[in-house]
């Protein structure tokens, strides 16, 4: 029975980190294929009788933080994307004689309250490069 385990690995920045994770996961028993998508920070392991906990533990042993892939609706990254049937939605500008071009399904994006307001203020941006902040950016 072939299984797929999808993991989110934040801060997956360079090709060296990706190859290190690929080699680490290919050493696990049962892993046949490892796919690393750096732009989405996603690692997919496919194989025979894979256990999510063992794959997570192997990634963490390689020195990376890891969690199970939080977007369970296929490979869609739009977790806040909703579809409603046409009888639920309001037709503000529709004419009664026209047919519904959407096929009866209306979609929209729901923006969570956390992202609808600017989060970073001037103080936070200024303290990113401060010498007093131990977690500051090391570019300077």
Curated annotation (Swiss-Prot):
The modification Cysteine methyl ester is found at residue 137. PROSITE patterns: HMA_2. InterPro entries: HMA_dom, HMA_dom_sf. Gene3D superfamilies: 3.30.70.100. A metal cation binds at residues 14, 17. Residues 3-67 form the HMA domain. Keywords: Lipoprotein, Metal-binding, Methylation, Prenylation. A lipid is attached at residue 137 (S-farnesyl cysteine). PANTHER family: COPPER TRANSPORT PROTEIN ATOX1-RELATED, HEAVY METAL-ASSOCIATED ISOPRENYLATED PLANT PROTEIN 31. Belongs to the HIPP family. Heavy-metal-binding protein. This is Heavy metal-associated isoprenylated plant protein 31. The gene is HIPP31.
């Amino acid at each position: 029975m072939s299984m797929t385990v999808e993991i989110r690995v934040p801060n997956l920045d360079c090709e060296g980190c990706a190859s290190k994770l690929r080699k680490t996961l290919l050493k696990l028993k049962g892993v046949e294929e490892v796919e690393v998508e750096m732009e989405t920070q996603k690692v997919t392991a496919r194989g025979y009788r894979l256990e999510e906990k063992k794959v997570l533990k192997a990634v963490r042993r390689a020195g990376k933080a890891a969690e199970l892939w939080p977007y369970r609706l296929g490979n869609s990254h739009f977790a806040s994307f909703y579809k409603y049937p046409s009888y639920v939605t309001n037709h503000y500008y529709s004419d009664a004689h026209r047919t519904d071009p959407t096929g009866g399904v209306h979609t929209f994006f729901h923006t969570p309250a956390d992202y609808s307001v600017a989060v970073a203020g001037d103080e936070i941006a200024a303290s990113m490069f401060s010498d007093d902040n131990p977690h500051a950016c090391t570019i300077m």
